[in-house]
Structures are given as structure tokens and as C-alpha cells.
Swiss-Prot record:
HAMAP family from the UniProt entry: HemL_aminotrans_3 (MF_00375)
Gene Ontology terms for molecular function: glutamate-1-semialdehyde 2,1-aminomutase activity; pyridoxal phosphate binding; transaminase activity
InterPro entries: 4pyrrol_synth_GluAld_NH2Trfase, Aminotrans_3, Aminotrans_3_PPA_site, PyrdxlP-dep_Trfase, PyrdxlP-dep_Trfase_major, PyrdxlP-dep_Trfase_small
Entry-linked PANTHER family: GLUTAMATE-1-SEMIALDEHYDE 2,1-AMINOMUTASE (PTHR43713), GLUTAMATE-1-SEMIALDEHYDE 2,1-AMINOMUTASE 1, CHLOROPLASTIC-RELATED (PTHR43713:SF3)
Name of this protein: Glutamate-1-semialdehyde 2,1-aminomutase
EC class name: isomerase
Signal peptide boundaries: none
KW Cytoplasm (keyword) present: yes
Cofactor: pyridoxal 5'-phosphate
Location of the protein in the cell: Cytoplasm
Length: 427
């Protein structure tokens, strides 16, 4: 029995399902989860000492690679000063200033500890600001595990085949209207029917939790125009795509401004940190200035802030995103080329440092199209690549991530492994 198997059996005795987040359990793809012993750059090593090229990167945060020396040094420099204070620090101001500089639509920002906290707080703020209750979200978009957002969500729920979580009261779910992603006609119809009841529309402008699905410019521009017309708050959930698709996130990529933005992943540099922010007149409704309450003991934690601030500084290096985008595109295009050569129906897409792999005939644009993926073939591909030492997301419904440490040699090794994997699939 491998060390991974021993650890998984042991974990299941004290941890539900043996994991602290469902997708890690390999339930979708089968087999034994890999328990990570250490990581460095684009690699991690499991409990059995096997090395893997890592295309998850902690589900997005590790954009400069694992254990970047400057991030490590930044964390080490603050450790001796204290782990948590429950009081403000200068470092909180510094990371807030950096975020506001990089995402111009964010005039003020509030730090929290997780993406779920960010989206949950942004929705409460939007409701408090507008005095309305209804929110609109989109099929397959995952915004964390708050009750009102676990309605036809993607990510782990899609992996387990459950569009809506048990334990969500109908009285809460009734305030959430779910529309098809990228469907402008459905959006216009909804706003025509009850636009003046909508407090907020929350959307992943680049969805990463039903695999990678891009929002179309037409769809996102329609969202912006309709929210403005009806006085609804437009919330971009950029927890995943923020600082991933461009330095200024999806808003820079599309040239569309949100009223509120949720951030996470990259802004913690691998530590637990997230944020929400936006227009000053909306943020002024937050306590202690306004009547919308939001708080957190570990919000703005000094260690997380140190890691996040250094990461945000590193990604501003000249040419950083050009190189990262090019490497990610090279990976996606290369995988698609290897599949074509083997005669395997497969397509790939990338935007910035995110990519999607699909066992379909074309790149999907909606939740419904994503669910047509050949999951059995994906599962075989996943395990073939895992055996080759390449770690993709253990689900056909998750995006992948590339870091600045995934150099040409790493991409070449991945494509060589994929050539063998696709050949095995075609046999």
C-alpha cells in the first residue's frame, strides 16, 4: 500500500471524506488523492516522493510558483513581529493601496480571509445599498458556499452531479434568480420582468468553476448596461480570474467596469486572504461607516498580507503577463495539437494564465455545453497524465493554471507526456 493510500485511509477516520475541500477527494476521477509533502516552483512531491508538474497551483494563487524566494522572505520578515493582532496595521494600508492602483474600479477595499467571505459580503452590501433582495447569478458560476449562492453552482457541486447543495432553505434560494451564462436574450428578459427588484448581478467574467468558460464581450457589456439602467449593482467575482487573465484582471481585459469586485487567490500569495471593493459610495455603507455589518478576526492577517503584497509587486514586472500568457497558450495549443494527431476529439482554450481542457468538439460557452464533455475519457486522460507525473485538475469541470515558473522545459515535458497519453486513449 502506498503512503498516499495509507494517509487517505487515516484521514477518512477524522475528516469527512478524508479531505477539507471535496474536489481533492478524486471522487470524480477515481483513485487515491495525492497527499502533498512539499512544493517548489512548478512542481510538487507527494507522500511517496513522486514529483509532479503542478497545473493547479493551489487552484490559482501560486502565479509566481511555489515557495518563490521573495515571497518566502517577505513572510519570514514579519513572522517574528506577531501572527495576528485584531488591530489595524500599516501593511493593510499598503496592500489596499496596491489593489486600488491595479484595479481602478476599486476605490475602496475591505480585506477578508476567503473568497466565500468576499462574495457573501459583497452581496450583503449590494442589498444594503439598494434596499432590494433579489440577486441574479448564472448557471455553472461558483461564488463560494454561502447559501444564496449554492443554487445551480458549478465547481465541486458540478463534479458531484448536484446543481444545488442540500441544506439551502427554499426561503433563501427563492431570492436567487439563475440565468444561462452568455445568454443576452435571457438577461434582457429577466431585467424586463423584474429589473427594479434586482439588488445585484454577480458573475465570473471568466468562469473557472465549470471548466474555463469565457464571458463574451456582448454578454458582459449587456450586463453593465442593464445594471446601470435599473440601478442594480454589478459584481464581478474575480476571485479566480483577478490578476490571472491580466494585471488588472478581467475588467482590464474586457474594458468593462464593475461596481463591486471580489478578489482572492493571487492576493494572498498562497495564504488565506481575499477582498471585496468598489465604488466609494457603495463601500461607505459598510460598518463602521454604514449599516451593513461585516467583520472578521483574521481579516488583514499580517502574514497573509505580507505574502500577498509581495506577490502583487512581483507580477508587475515588465513583460510578466506577456510571457505568462504566451506559455499558457503554448500549453493549450500544444495539447490540442497532440490530440488531433492522435485522432482524439479534444479542444483546449486559454486566457491569460488560465486554461481549459475539453473532451468535446468545440470550446463550450455555457454550463449546458460543458456538461456534454466526455467525462469518462477525461478521467482516463487524467490518470494517464498523473502516471506521467503531470497533475491536472482532478475533475473535468475545473480550470487549470500556469505559473511564471512553468518554463519551456516544463511545457515540453508536459506535451511529450500528453503525446503518449493521447496515443493510449486512441488505441
Amino acid at each position: 500500500m502506498s503512503n498516499n493510500q495509507i494517509l487517505f485511509e487515516r484521514a477518512q477516520k477524522t475528516i469527512p471524506g478524508g479531505v477539507n475541500s471535496p474536489v481533492r477527494a478524486f471522487r470524480s476521477v477515481g483513485g487515491t488523492p495525492r497527499f502533498v509533502a512539499r512544493a517548489q516552483g512548478p512542481y510538487f512531491w507527494d507522500a511517496d516522493g513522486k514529483q509532479y508538474i503542478d497545473y493547479i497551483g493551489s487552484w490559482g494563487p501560486m502565479i509566481v510558483g511555489h515557495v518563490h524566494p521573495e515571497v518566502l522572505s517577505a513572510v519570514q520578515n514579519v513572522l517574528a513581529d506577531g501572527f495576528s493582532f485584531g488591530a489595524p496595521t500599516e501593511a493593510e494600508i499598503e496592500i489596499a493601496e496596491e489593489i486600488c492602483k491595479l484595479v481602478p474600479s476599486i476605490e475602496q477595499v475591505r480585506m477578508v480571509s476567503s473568497g466565500t467571505e468576499a462574495t457573501m459580503s459583497a452581496l450583503r452590501l449590494a442589498r444594503g445599498f439598494t434596499g432590494r433582495s433579489r440577486i441574479v447569478k448564472f448557471e455553472g458560476c461558483y461564488h463560494g458556499h454561502a447559501d444564496s449562492l449554492l443554487v445551480k453552482a458549478g465547481s465541486g457541486l458540478l463534479t458531484f452531479g448536484n446543481p444545488t447543495s442540500a441544506g439551502v432553505p427554499a426561503d433563501i434560494a427563492k431570492h436567487t434568480t439563475v440565468l444561462e451564462y452568455n445568454n443576452v436574450a435571457a438577461l434582457e428578459e429577466a431585467f424586463g420582468a423584474f429589473g427594479d427588484e434586482i439588488a445585484a448581478v454577480i458573475v465570473e467574467p471568466v468562469a473557472g468553476n465549470m471548466n474555463l468558460v469565457r464571458g463574451t464581450p456582448e454578454f458582459l457589456n449587456a450586463l453593465r448596461a442593464l445594471c446601470t439602467k435599473h440601478g442594480a449593482v454589478l459584481i464581478f467575482d474575480e476571485v479566480m480570474c483577478g490578476f490571472r487573465v491580466a494585471l488588472g484582471g478581467a475588467q482590464q481585459h474586457y474594458g468593462i467596469t464593475a461596481d463591486l469586485t471580489c478578489l482572492g487567490k493571487v492576493i494572498g500569495g498562497g495564504m488565506p486572504a481575499a477582498a471585496f471593493g468598489g465604488r466609494r459610495d457603495i463601500m461607505a455603507h459598510l460598518a463602521p461607516l454604514g449599516g451593513v455589518y461585516q467583520a472578521g478576526t483574521l481579516s488583514g492577517n499580517p502574514i497573509a498580507v505580507a505574502a500577498g503584497l509581495k506577490t502583487l509587486q512581483l507580477i508587475q514586472a515588465p513583460g510578466f503577463y506577456d510571457a505568462l500568457t504566451a506559455q499558457t497558450k503554448r500549453l493549450a495549443d500544444g495539447l490540442a495539437a497532440e490530440a488531433r494527431a492522435a485522432g482524439v476529439p479534444f479542444v483546449a482554450d486559454s486566457i491569460g494564465a488560465m486554461f481549459g481542457l475539453y473532451f468535446t468538439e468545440r470550446v463550450p460557452t455555457s454550463f449546458a455545453e460543458v456538461t456534454k464533455s466526455d467525462t469518462e475519457r477525461f478521467n482516463r486522460f487524467f490518470h494517464l497524465m498523473l502516471d506521467e507525473g503531470v497533475y491536472f485538475a482532478p475533475s473535468a469541470y475545473e480550470a487549470g493554471f500556469v505559473s511564471s515558473t512553468h518554463d519551456d522545459a516544463v511545457i515540453d515535458a508536459t506535451l511529450a507526456a500528453a503525446r503518449r497519453a493521447f496515443a493510449a486513449l486512441a488505441a
